[in-house]
């Protein structure tokens, strides 16, 4: 009998593209290529509109998010616990759900350790007592799970300090079909980039949260423009803070910064293909999906020299130390001045092709099949 596995996804109202992607790809692969072995269904809920009904503010949204994660989602888990053979919590920041599910039949995908930093490294991320109590609930849920998946060897190594090693399974991400080197005049990128009027640009894909180091990105771009005044910066996915906007104005780069609205994967792939370089200056990443997406499109990449992006980018990616502005400028200029190279581009694409959502889905399915008790 085929097992029934529920994939519990983040609320779509969270607007975390990478988390939405991993849940989408897993369900899609299981339904498209593994339907003879598994039945699956994605479970997700909107963020409740409770506190915001009284006062619409960021603080109210955060309260509603907590209500969603710690009240509505656990209630959903309790209702569904008898309807599936296994439960896959697609994002570790929802690991509190393990407490409402049969732990021996529940797994969690741990993408990074950021959600646990306030208790694992309180000096680096001091938080309030209520926040730390919620975080402890998350960590306890992760530890209770029967199986914990992770995307990089480095994350697995760090997880071994507080999760039983026999529970850990390495299941790296994949590349969506849209990310490929073939030029497509109908991908929508030309329209999205029309205001650049054909100027060369560097691309950053990701949010504007602190660990993404938008400050470094802006400093590097300002220095690059001293060498290449025609250069532009395209940032996709970040809602800039007042401080970041102030920095852009102070550096006099705000007029050369383009932030298109959220684009479909087809258009984002076109933006990767047209970019002179893709930069990822984060000081921490669970994996660094933009690295392999860009490489799959043949784009040159400069990433922070941290273990996880080293794993993702391999020898076909350029690296610079975190926040070393001069190092970043030098590494990026080398790529910009070298120009396109068919042999190097092919090597990038070949490297990226080792990452497969099909294999990702296969590994995760095998993990749950291994939990099945003999009948």
Language model region names:
Residues 1-375:
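Carbohydrate transferase catalytic cores enriched for Leloir-type hexosyltransferases
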């Amino acid at each position: 009998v085929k097992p029934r596995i529920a994939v519990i996804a983040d609320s779509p109202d969270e607007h975390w593209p990478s988390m939405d992607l991993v849940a989408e790809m897993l369900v899609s692969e299981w339904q498209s290529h593994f339907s003879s072995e598994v039945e699956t269904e994605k479970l997700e809920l909107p963020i409740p509109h409770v506190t915001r009904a009284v006062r619409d503010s960021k603080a109210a949204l955060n309260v509603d998010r907590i209500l969603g994660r710690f009240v509505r989602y656990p209630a959903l888990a309790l209702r569904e616990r008898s309807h599936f053979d296994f439960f896959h919590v697609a994002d570790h920041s929802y690991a509190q759900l393990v407490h409402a599910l049969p732990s021996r039949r529940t797994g969690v995908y741990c993408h990074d350790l950021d959600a646990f930093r306030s208790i694992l490294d309180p000096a680096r991320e001091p938080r309030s007592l209520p926040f730390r109590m919620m975080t402890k609930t998350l960590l306890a849920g992760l530890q209770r799970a029967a199986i914990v998946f992770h995307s990089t060897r480095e994350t697995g190594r760090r997880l071994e300090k507080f999760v039983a090693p026999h529970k850990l399974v390495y299941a790296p991400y994949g590349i969506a079909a849209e990310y490929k080197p073939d030029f497509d005049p109908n991908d929508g990128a030309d329209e999205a980039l029309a205001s650049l009027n054909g100027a060369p640009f560097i691309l950053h894909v990701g949010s504007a949260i602190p660990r993404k180091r938008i400050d470094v990105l802006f400093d590097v771009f300002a220095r690059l423009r001293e060498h290449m005044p025609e250069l532009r910066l395209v940032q996709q996915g970040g809602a800039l803070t007042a401080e970041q906007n102030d920095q852009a104005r102070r550096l006099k780069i705000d007029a050369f910064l383009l932030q298109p609205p959220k684009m479909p994967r087809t258009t984002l792939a076109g933006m990767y293909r047209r970019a002179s370089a893709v930069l990822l200056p984060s000081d921490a990443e669970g994996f660094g999906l933009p690295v392999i997406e860009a490489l799959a499109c043949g784009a040159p990449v400069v990433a922070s020299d941290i273990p996880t992006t080293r794993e993702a980018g391999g020898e076909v990616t350029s690296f610079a130390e975190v926040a070393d502005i001069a190092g970043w400028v030098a590494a990026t200029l080398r790529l910009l001045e070298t120009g396109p190279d068919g042999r190097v581009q092919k090597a990038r694409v070949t490297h990226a092709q080792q990452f497969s959502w099909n294999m990702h889905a296969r590994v995760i399915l095998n993990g749950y099949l291994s939990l099945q008790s003999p009948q």
